[in-house]
Swiss-Prot record:
It comes from Aliivibrio fischeri (strain MJ11) (Vibrio fischeri). It catalyses: [protein-PII]-L-tyrosine + UTP = [protein-PII]-uridylyl-L-tyrosine + diphosphate; [protein-PII]-uridylyl-L-tyrosine + H2O = [protein-PII]-L-tyrosine + UMP + H(+). Its EC number is 2.7.7.59, 3.1.4.-. GO terms for molecular function: [protein-PII] uridylyltransferase activity; phosphoric diester hydrolase activity. It comes from the Bacteria. Residues 451-573 form the HD domain. Has four distinct domains: an N-terminal nucleotidyltransferase (NT) domain responsible for UTase activity, a central HD domain that encodes UR activity, and two C-terminal ACT domains that seem to have a role in glutamine sensing. Modifies, by uridylylation and deuridylylation, the PII regulatory proteins (GlnB and homologs), in response to the nitrogen status of the cell that GlnD senses through the glutamine level. Under low glutamine levels, catalyzes the conversion of the PII proteins and UTP to PII-UMP and PPi, while under higher glutamine levels, GlnD hydrolyzes PII-UMP to PII and UMP (deuridylylation). Thus, controls uridylylation state and activity of the PII proteins, and plays an important role in the regulation of nitrogen assimilation and metabolism. The lineage of its organism: Bacteria, Pseudomonadati, Pseudomonadota, Gammaproteobacteria, Vibrionales. PANTHER family: BIFUNCTIONAL URIDYLYLTRANSFERASE/URIDYLYL-REMOVING ENZYME, BIFUNCTIONAL URIDYLYLTRANSFERASE_URIDYLYL-REMOVING ENZYME. This is Bifunctional uridylyltransferase/uridylyl-removing enzyme. Uridylyltransferase (UTase) activity is inhibited by glutamine, while glutamine activates uridylyl-removing (UR) activity. Belongs to the GlnD family.
């Protein structure tokens, strides 16, 4: 059944039931047309035209034409004739001297009918004088009025309003420009000034539709241009820029139209819950999340293009039109470039096309002069043109190769040259591999940025290691980085570390090959190329070892040291690792990770200096820890006999797994503890190893770990590491390293409350009821398959279990309870959260103390999959 033109509807058909049916038919027609690939620009204009007809017909039905000096005006996006399925329909009822009861009643009836039809109507009733007065004091109203478009009623009245709005007295062009620039800056800051947000807003994110609107509003105010085409005809855009903006707008409109098809209520955020369905509407398909990632890659690239055009065109408008003749004097730098104020400028109009390698010269000059903080708008425009006309990548030009290598060696290039090269599309023009990762995202909560943005942020973090003010946050890297002789090798490794993402296969392996080829083609020696290639191949090695292995096990350190081989590679790797973690997600680096990386670095450095053929003697380590702890305890007034009597209850493993400070702390409180059968809970007053340490002494019970984990989870406290052991006489000696919900150590004020809360849960209970928090909204849109892998230990006496699952509240407690139910002993846990994924390591033994046999492993796997599934149901 086809919808009818609203103008053809009779008075008897203008009832809610009939109109709702017509609106449904029209909307369904548009959805079908969208899926049949009708141009979205036609659809949004068509939708606007449909509502023009509907409102005109209702205007006639309510006899507004009988009222003199009244007209119906479309404003805002509706005024631009741009309506998406859930767009607001903003109207202005313009009237002069019509405020009587009859008029007000008609307006009320019209608006009520539109609301009853579930339309998002924004309406105002004003005179011309009121419009001007309010608009002069309200930028949003002024902007909406500027887009006013006549629908029906008194046309002359609408014309008079337009004359007033477009007069110089109503928001002069320069004032309007500055107000819109300030408005855009505030809007961009709400989105962290980046086009790369995990759940971007199609309309308001930097590079979104609002950036195109800002250009059109400013051009409309100054030139009277009402479309991108008219902006081009007015000379504000070149033909190429006009076509590019039109192409970007068309894509963003298609994404927005598809999103509105999916939603029931107005929203422009491309949330995780809707990215997959929008991708499907747009025809982006692929295995797993490939369709979403392909769509988002195109989306981010489009935002990037719009943001670049927006920035350049607004600067051109400011300099060439508003402030023509007011520019700073040019200071000549060399034959090709000059500086004007704080901007660098090409001295010849076709410099980059004639000699493409001079593009690199510009960034070398920026690195040389810290007072230059940008590129002049005409030079940006020239660069964009030259970039598009290149018939080969810049890395294929020998002169450009030499200059790029100079940039990697320049001490100031990390500060702004590389980020500017990326922002202006030069890295993509230089490296073919880089052009493939621009906009490449991963559909998860772990990677906050696209691959290209992450890599640029990594370079910036490396630069921070040369600033001594960052020593507290990055003590090892700030100590090491200034001493690294060939920093360019680290920079090249940083550029290539993720460059093969999105290709399929192991990105570390593929990137290592690319990095080696790059180094050789740029004249580096084979040993240098091998080092860079190894760094790219191994860039995850240190973080994985620190976070998912027991780095206090000498065997783990020996194995890691064998892969690193020497201190030079260790120094390069730790700088790359820390910068990589910091650049992945702003919330990822914390005191706990800093402590883990530092402990792994220091232990590996000691192993390399001692020689891998000389492993440490574990008995010496036990004696050392006992001697140091004993001295501390004697200074507190305890006798050696008391200390020895306590320690005779402990197994040798206890003295290996704890530092002498931890051992002394535990003993000091246990020796004062009057009733040894009563539980004791300690919380460290000072942050230890980057977190808060909780020590639990209690009669050992199967569910003890699960009980503590469940209670901590309920309090939004995260366990990062756990040592689970028992004394010879059956008492638990469990240590939990924890952080609060902000990834900070537990503050002192909260510590006593937490101790009381843990005592209240009755640690000696045989079973625990796991109460879980509500999972975050974003988790609902991810499906991480629960899986585990069992690995033997070097001695063969224990089993390592690598465990992966959706990081649902209550997960760790559920895992612990499952161990207890099956009679499996837990000895240690390393807890790692990677976005929506939990990737944990557990060290286990059977109920008789040996490794888990195949049958027990199978039983555990079935039970864990079943119990974890219950958490999400």
């Amino acid at each position: 059944m086809k919808y009818l033109s609203p103008l053809s509807l009779s008075d008897t058909q203008l009832n809610i039931t009939e109109l709702k049916q017509q609106l449904t038919l029209f909307s369904q027609y548009q959805i079908n047309a969208f899926h049949q690939h009708k141009a979205v620009s036609d659809l949004v204009f068509e939708r606007s035209h449909y509502f023009d007809q509907l409102l005109s017909r209702l205007w006639q039905f309510f006899k507004f034409d009988d009222i003199a000096n009244t007209s119906l005006i479309a404003v805002g996006g509706y005024g631009r004739s741009e309506l998406h399925p859930l767009s607001d329909i903003d109207i202005l009822i313009l009237t002069e001297n019509n405020t009587n009861d009859t008029f007000c009643q008609k307006v009320g009836e019209l608006v009520t009918l539109l609301w009853d039809l579930k339309l998002e109507i924004g309406h105002s009733v004003r005179s011309i004088a009121e419009c001007i007065e309010i608009g002069q004091n309200d930028l949003t109203v002024a902007t909406n009025l500027q887009e006013a478009r006549y629908i029906c009623g008194n046309k002359e009245l609408s014309h008079q309003l337009k004359l007033k709005i477009h007069s110089d007295s109503f928001w002069p062009s320069e004032s309007f420009y500055q107000a819109k620039i300030d408005e855009q800056k505030k809007r961009h800051s709400r989105y962290h000034d980046t086009t790369y947000n995990l759940e971007p807003d199609i309309k308001s994110s930097p590079g979104g539709l609002r950036d195109i609107h800002t250009l059109s509003w400013i051009a409309r105010r100054h030139f009277g241009a009402t479309s991108l085409l008219e902006m081009s005809q007015a000379g504000f855009l070149t033909d190429a820029e006009y076509r590019e903006l039109l192409e970007c707008q068309e894509f963003l409109w298609r994404v927005r139209f598809a999103l509105h098809i999916e939603l029931k209520r107005y929203d422009n955020r491309l949330t995780f819950g809707h990215q997959a369905s929008v991708a499907e509407h747009l025809g982006f398909i692929g295995e797993g999340n490939r369709g979403v990632e392909r769509m988002m890659k195109e989306f981010y690239r489009t935002l990037r293009r719009v943001a670049e055009l927006n920035s350049m065109l607004l600067k051109i408008f400011d300099q060439a039109i508003l402030h023509q003749g007011e520019q700073d004097d040019a200071i000549i730098i060399d034959d090709d470039f000059q500086r004007r104020g704080r901007l660098i400028e090409a001295r010849k109009p076709a410099l980059f096309q004639a000699r493409p390698d001079t593009i690199l010269d510009m960034f070398l000059l920026m690195a040389n002069d810290s007072t230059i903080d940008g590129v002049a708008p005409p030079t940006m425009r020239q660069l964009r043109t030259a970039r598009r006309r290149l018939n080969r990548f810049l890395c294929e030009i020998p002169e450009a190769k030499e200059k790029f290598l100079q940039l990697t060696q320049h001490p100031n290039a990390l500060n702004n040259a590389f980020s500017s090269m990326h922002k202006l599309g030069v890295l993509s023009a230089y490296l073919p591999q880089w052009s493939h990762i621009v906009g490449q995202m991963q559909f998860d909560l772990f990677h906050a940025y696209t691959v290209d943005e992450h890599s640029i942020r990594l370079l910036k973090h490396i630069n921070k290691f040369s600033d001594t003010t960052n020593r507290d946050k990055h003590p090892i890297c700030c100590e090491i980085f200034p001493k690294i002789m060939k920093k360019e090798l680290l920079i090249i490794a940083a550029i290539f570390h993720d460059i093969a993402k999105g290709r399929g296969g192991d990105h570390s392996e593929l990137g290592a090959v690319d990095a080696y080829d790059f180094c050789i083609s740029h004249g580096l020696s084979k040993p240098e190329a091998n080092l860079v290639s190894w760094l790219v191949k191994s860039h995850l090695l240190m973080s994985v070892t620190a976070q998912r292995r027991d780095i206090y096990d000498p065997d783990v350190i020996t194995e890691f040291a064998k892969q690193v081989r020497d201190e030079e590679r260790l120094d390069y790797l730790v700088c790359l690792t820390v910068a990589d973690i910091c650049a992945t997600n702003p919330d990822l680096w914390n005191s706990w990770k800093r402590s883990l990386i530092a402990d792994l670095y220091n232990a590996t450095q000691r192993a390399l200096r001692r020689g891998l053929e000389n492993p440490p003697d574990l008995r010496d380590r036990i004696r050392h820890n006992q001697q140091m702890a004993s001295a501390q305890l004697r200074s507190e007034g305890f006798t050696q006999w008391e200390v020895d009597a306590l320690w005779r209850r402990f197994k040798a493993d206890y003295f290996l797994r704890h530092t002498h400070k931890q051992i002394a702390w535990h003993a000091s409180h246990l020796l004062r503890h009057q009733d040894k059968e009563k539980s004791l809970i300690l919380i460290s007053k000072n942050a230890s190893r980057g977190g808060t340490e909780i020590f639990v002494y209690s009669k050992d019970q199967p569910h003890l770990f699960a009980t503590v984990a469940a209670e901590l989870d309920r309090r939004s406290i995260t366990i990062y590491d756990a040592q689970v052991m028992s004394s010879k006489d059956g008492y638990a000696l469990d240590t939990f390293m924890v952080l609060d919900q902000n990834d900070d150590p537990i503050d002192e004020e909260r510590q006593q409350r937490l101790i009381d809360q843990l005592y209240d849960v009755k640690l000696n209970d045989q079973a625990t009821h796991i109460k879980t928090r509500r999972p975050p909204r974003q988790l609902q849109h991810f499906n991480v398959k629960t899986r585990m892998e069992f690995l033997p230990t070097k001695t063969g006496k224990r089993t390592l279990m690598e465990f992966v699952a959706l990081d649902t509240p209550g997960l760790l407690a559920t895992v612990g309870a499952t161990f207890a139910q099956l009679g499996i002993n837990l000895h240690a846990a390393k807890i790692t959260t990677i976005g929506e994924r939990a990737e944990d390591l557990f060290i286990l033994t059977s109920d008789v103390g040996g490794r888990l046999d195949d049958d027990k492993q199978a039983e555990l796997e079935i039970a864990l999959v079943k119990n974890v599934a219950r958490l999400s149901s």
